[in-house]
Structures are given as structure tokens and as C-alpha cells.
């Protein structure tokens, strides 16, 4: 069987996967047949018959050709020859096209060298320089005089039109340039005015062509430090526009209120900038700076309050609250300066002053924290570590609370000692006490290595101490009370330390640390009671002259801690004296006793063992009528019958 090789010369007709759209088919029919008016049934039938006859003719020719049995080698040779001819024709066409392209490119290089060079071949670039070929008209046909005149008139018109257009463009450009110069002059003059007033003007980090003003604090928390840079935009007329970015449009300020027994009795004054015109560029910069500072202040207050929950500090929605005493508390919130601050009918001058002082204090402490950040940044950094360094909370609430609590305890102790010693003076017992508030604050020895302001603030960040020195009635007896408040390191809060010097009761020593007012009051009155009992037993005071010749009774202390003394007369009669001391009064009661009851302790009336006193005397600090002194009363009851 002989091998046959057939090579189809027609392109294969593939079935389309999708039908042509109707508009496409209509376009094809129009391109093939022309207008639909020229197409009728007879024309179409004739065309169909013509196509059928053509197919039959081609099939017959192919059938006859296929019947010829050619040798396989000859067919392959013919195929290779045909392919070589086709390739040669294609290469020749390509070369002719490239020659034509080089010719056109070289011709155009006379007028547009850069554009023409991109389409030239490398060989042509080497052998022919750019612009070496040009074209011109040779023996142009003569033109009539009318055509020449028309050409000159047209060219003159085009030149005049071009000159007018150029003049209009120049005038418009000059006007626009004048406007731009005026705008730029105004813009740069306002920028220089901002710089001359001390503000830092620099380029924006992400916009190299824009200027910005640095009104924030470089040592602030990163989220507020990055917001402290605003762009200085130029308006259409050249005015300066401050693009504040994330800073709110309205001003904000931290408000401090003092609430006493559930009623707001004091409020700080809203902080306002000293600039008269708030709409000026400086006024807007100051407003943005102050608002950013107030937001950072409240942010740090809330951040510090979250770690002070165990010390009575609570936070709410836009509110920080802490108690100073049982009746007094302080509230801090971030509000609009135009909001109503407090009811004037309930305002107390003292609490208003306290609120203003607290508002100034927390702002000063935040500025001090910024300075500490700057000082820390200028020092050598600590060793590198994989652990993330914790940013400590600023000392804003803790020093403020320490001062308020310490002031409250100092005022209470001073008032208590004043009342007790007033009672003693009313009883004729000469004694006094000396108060030294804030003894730990030594302004004379401020650290000189730092600025004065920082050294002054540093004094109030230390634990606060106040001392009270009191003399007792008996000579060489005294006691000291030291009030110490610390909210930075444990133990937190206010503690009282009492030191006692009482030679006649050497075993009596107070606790090392007391934290309650009631305990302090009890200890102080107890020491004074012991000293009064000792004074009576030793007969201190002025002797009382008596007309009768009687021997005064000698008092013996039986229960010193309960203020009880016993006296036995020469005839065997016995008397008991009970001394009671409180903040408001000093009372002395005399009782007649018999037998073994003399050495038993007196108890309250509810016990059923305390008889009615035979004599008694009470002294108060605000007594309207004069009374005999304590020693005079003791001398009068010490007469034996």
C-alpha cells in the first residue's frame, strides 16, 4: 500500500462556539451585499447556485489530482521548495518594509530628530547622521498672481491672529502672575509673622512641598506629639489656613469641681488664651495648642486613675472622681469652656480657690513631666533588652490627692489640739502646742542642679510631713505627733506617728503608726489625762489658803489610765476622784467611799456600782461664766474635816 500525503490549501472552517450577535450579522451583510434595497430573492438564489457550481468544480479537480499517485519523496521535495519560496517572499517583504521605514525615519530626522531616531535601525544610525536627508519641491508649477495674493493675505491674517492670541495670553499670564505674586507675598508674610512670634515652622514629613507649624509638645505622649504639627495651607487670596488635622475644631479644657455633701460648691475657672482675636492665625494656633494640651492632660489623668482604684479613685465616661474626706470629693472632666461650670447660689469661695489651685497644679505637673521626659531623653539610653519598656504614669493625681488629704488631716489635728488645749486653759492648766505644717517642704534647700521651677515642684512630689509639738502640764513632759502622707509607694495614705516623753509613766508608749482620727484623739486625750492625774497627785499648782487649820488630803493614784485617785483622811474617811477629759470638756467628780470599795475601780452607772458624786466640776473652752481652776477645785475638796 503506497503512502499518500495530502496538504490542504484551504483554511479549516471551525464551528463557532457562540452565535454572532444581530448587529454584527447586519454589518457583515451590509459589507458583503450592500444595501438591503439591492438584495432580493432572485439575486440570492443565483448566488447560491453559483457557489454550488464552484464547489463542484473544485471537488472534481481535487478528485482528479488525488488520483495521480505521486511518489512520497517528490511530494516532500515540492513541499520544502514551496515553504522556502514562501519564507523568501516573507523575508523580502520584511526587508523592503524596513528599508521604507529607515528611509522615512531618515527623512523625518531633519525636522523631528528625537521621534525619528526611535524608529531607525541600528545600522542606519551608524552609517548616516541624523538630518542628512531632506526633501524639497523641484520645479514647482507656477502660481497665478491671484493665488499668490490670496496666500499672502491668508498668511498675514494668520500672523495677526497669532499675535492677538499671544498678546491675550501674555496679558492673562501677567494678570495671573500679579495675582500669584500678591497671594504668595501675603502667604509668606503671614508665615514669617508666625515664625517671628516664636513658633517653629518646618516642612511636613509626608508633604515635602508643604510647610507646617509645630504647636505641640515634643516631649508629650507619641499619640499627642504627632498631632502637634499642623499644615499651613494657602487660600485663594493668599491667606493662611491652619490645617489642624485631628485636633477638634472646638476648644476643650479640663474642669475641676469640688463637691461637698453631694452639692457642687466650687469650680475652677475656664482657661482662655490671652490673644484678643481668636479668629487670627495666632489665635487658632494657640487654641489648637491649648486644646491638645488639655486632651493630653485628661488622657494622663484617666491613665493614672486606672491604677489608683484601690485608693478610692473612680473613672466614668469623661469623668475622674476621688474623695478627700467623708463629705468632700473632687471631680475632673473634659468639657467645652463655654459650658456652665457651677451654680453661683451654692458656690463657696474657699472651695472655688481650691478648685482653681488644683487646676493649676495638674497643669504644672504635666509640664514637669514633659521636662522629665526631655531630661531622660538627653541621658545615655539603658541597655537593650527584648522586653518592652513600660512607660510610667505621670504623677498628676497622686501628688494632688496627697496634698489634699494631708491638708485635711493637718487641719483636723490642729483643730482637735486647739479644742483640747482650750479646755485645759479654761481649767487653769497652762500648756501649749506648736504646729509646723509641711515641715518636709524645705524651700531653702532646693536642688540647684535643676531649674528653680523643677526643684520647687520636686519638693511637693516627696512624702508630705507635718509635725505638732505639745507640752504637757508636768515639767519635762511632752509629746510629738508627726503626720505623714505618701501616695507614691506603699504604705499609701496618711499615718500618724506619736512620740511621748513622760518620765513618771515610762512604760506608756504609743503605737508606732496610727491611721485613724479616733485613735489619734484617744491617744492624745489619754496622755493628757495621765499628766493631769500625775499633776493632781503631786500637788502641782497654786496652793489654796484656808482660814481653818486643817491638813489637806493627799491624793494617791489608783487607776491612772482611768483617771481615778484616792485620798484617805486622818479620821479614816475616804474620797475618790474621777477625772474625765474629752475634746469638748474636762470634768472632775468626787465620791465618798467606805471599806474595800476604796480600791475598786469606778464603773458606769449602768453597772449599778457608781454612787452619785458628792461634788463635781466641768470646764469647757467656751464657758460663759468663770469657774475656779482645776487645782483650786482640787484644793477645795482636799480639805479634811
From Swiss-Prot:
The keyword Coiled coil applies. Residues 159-186 form a coiled coil. One of its GO terms (molecular function) is transcription coregulator activity. It is found in: Nucleus. GO terms for cellular component: core mediator complex; mediator complex. One of its GO terms (biological process) is regulation of transcription by RNA polymerase II. Keywords: Activator, Coiled coil, Nucleus, Transcription, Transcription regulation. Component of the Mediator complex. Belongs to the Mediator complex subunit 17 family. Component of the Mediator complex, a coactivator involved in the regulated transcription of nearly all RNA polymerase II-dependent genes. Mediator functions as a bridge to convey information from gene-specific regulatory proteins to the basal RNA polymerase II transcription machinery. Mediator is recruited to promoters by direct interactions with regulatory proteins and serves as a scaffold for the assembly of a functional preinitiation complex with RNA polymerase II and the general transcription factors. This is Mediator of RNA polymerase II transcription subunit 17. It comes from Aspergillus clavatus (strain ATCC 1007 / CBS 513.65 / DSM 816 / NCTC 3887 / NRRL 1 / QM 1276 / 107).
Amino acid at each position: 500500500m503506497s503512502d499518500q500525503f495530502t496538504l490542504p490549501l484551504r483554511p479549516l472552517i471551525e464551528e463557532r462556539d457562540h452565535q454572532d450577535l444581530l448587529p454584527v450579522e447586519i454589518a457583515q451583510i451590509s459589507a458583503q451585499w450592500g444595501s438591503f434595497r439591492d438584495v432580493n430573492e432572485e439575486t440570492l438564489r443565483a448566488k447560491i447556485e453559483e457557489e454550488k457550481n464552484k464547489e463542484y468544480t473544485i471537488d472534481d479537480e481535487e478528485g482528479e489530482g488525488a488520483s495521480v499517485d505521486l511518489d512520497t519523496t517528490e511530494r516532500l521535495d515540492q513541499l520544502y521548495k514551496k515553504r522556502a519560496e514562501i519564507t523568501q517572499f516573507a523575508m523580502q517583504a520584511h526587508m523592503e518594509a524596513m528599508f521604507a521605514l529607515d528611509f522615512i525615519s531618515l527623512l523625518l530626522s531633519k525636522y523631528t530628530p528625537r521621534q525619528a531616531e526611535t524608529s531607525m535601525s541600528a545600522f542606519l544610525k551608524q552609517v548616516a547622521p541624523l538630518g542628512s536627508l531632506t526633501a524639497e519641491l523641484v520645479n514647482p508649477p507656477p502660481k497665478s498672481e491671484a493665488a499668490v495674493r490670496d496666500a499672502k493675505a491668508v498668511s498675514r491674517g494668520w500672523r495677526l491672529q497669532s499675535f492677538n492670541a499671544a498678546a491675550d495670553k501674555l496679558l492673562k499670564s501677567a494678570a495671573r502672575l500679579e495675582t500669584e505674586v500678591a497671594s504668595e507675598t501675603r502667604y509668606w508674610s503671614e508665615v514669617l509673622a508666625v515664625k517671628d512670634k516664636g513658633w517653629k515652622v518646618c516642612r511636613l514629613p509626608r508633604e515635602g512641598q508643604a510647610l507646617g507649624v509645630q504647636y505641640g509638645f515634643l516631649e508629650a505622649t507619641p499619640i499627642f506629639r504627632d498631632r502637634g504639627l499642623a499644615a499651613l495651607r494657602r487660600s485663594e487670596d493668599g491667606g493662611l489656613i491652619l490645617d489642624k488635622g485631628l485636633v477638634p475644631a472646638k476648644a476643650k479644657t479640663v474642669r475641676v469641681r469640688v463637691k461637698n455633701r453631694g452639692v457642687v460648691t466650687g469650680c475652677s475657672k475656664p482657661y482662655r488664651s490671652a490673644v484678643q482675636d481668636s479668629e487670627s492665625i495666632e489665635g487658632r494656633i494657640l487654641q489648637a495648642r491649648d486644646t491638645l494640651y488639655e486632651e493630653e492632660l485628661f488622657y494622663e489623668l484617666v491613665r493614672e486613675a486606672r491604677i489608683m482604684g484601690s485608693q478610692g479613685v473612680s473613672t466614668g465616661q469623661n469623668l475622674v472622681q476621688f474623695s478627700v474626706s467623708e463629705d468632700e470629693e473632687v471631680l475632673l472632666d473634659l468639657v467645652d469652656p463655654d459650658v456652665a461650670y457651677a451654680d453661683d447660689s451654692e458656690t463657696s469661695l474657699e472651695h472655688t480657690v481650691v478648685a482653681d489651685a488644683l487646676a493649676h497644679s495638674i497643669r504644672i505637673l504635666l509640664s514637669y513631666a514633659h521636662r522629665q521626659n526631655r531630661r531622660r531623653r538627653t541621658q545615655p539610653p539603658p541597655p537593650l533588652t527584648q522586653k518592652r519598656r513600660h512607660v510610667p504614669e505621670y504623677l498628676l493625681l497622686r501628688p494632688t490627692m496627697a496634698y489634699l488629704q494631708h491638708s485635711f488631716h493637718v487641719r483636723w489635728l490642729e483643730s482637735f489640739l486647739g479644742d483640747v488645749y482650750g479646755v485645759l486653759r479654761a481649767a487653769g492648766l497652762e500648756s501649749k502646742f506648736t504646729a509646723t505644717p509641711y515641715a518636709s517642704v524645705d524651700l531653702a534647700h532646693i536642688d540647684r542642679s535643676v531649674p528653680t521651677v523643677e526643684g520647687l515642684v520636686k519638693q511637693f512630689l516627696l512624702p508630705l510631713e507635718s509635725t505638732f509639738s505639745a507640752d504637757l502640764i508636768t515639767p519635762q513632759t511632752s509629746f510629738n505627733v508627726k503626720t505623714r502622707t505618701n501616695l507614691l509607694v506603699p504604705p499609701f495614705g496618711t499615718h500618724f506617728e506619736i512620740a511621748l516623753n513622760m518620765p513618771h509613766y515610762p512604760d506608756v508608749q504609743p503605737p508606732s503608726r496610727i491611721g485613724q482620727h479616733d485613735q489619734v484623739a484617744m491617744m492624745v486625750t489619754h496622755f493628757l489625762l495621765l499628766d493631769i492625774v500625775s499633776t493632781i497627785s503631786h500637788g502641782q499648782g497654786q496652793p489654796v489658803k484656808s482660814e481653818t487649820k486643817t491638813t489637806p488630803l493627799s491624793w494617791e493614784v489608783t487607776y491612772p489610765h482611768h483617771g481615778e485617785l484616792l485620798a484617805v483622811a486622818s479620821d479614816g474617811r475616804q474620797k475618790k476622784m474621777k477625772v474625765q477629759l474629752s475634746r469638748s470638756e474636762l470634768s472632775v467628780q468626787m465620791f465618798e467611799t467606805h471599806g474595800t470599795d476604796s480600791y475598786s475601780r469606778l464603773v458606769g452607772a449602768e453597772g449599778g456600782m457608781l454612787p452619785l458624786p458628792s461634788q463635781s466640776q466641768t470646764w469647757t473652752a467656751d464657758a460663759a461664766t468663770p469657774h475656779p481652776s482645776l487645782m483650786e477645785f482640787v484644793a477645795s475638796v482636799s480639805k479634811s474635816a
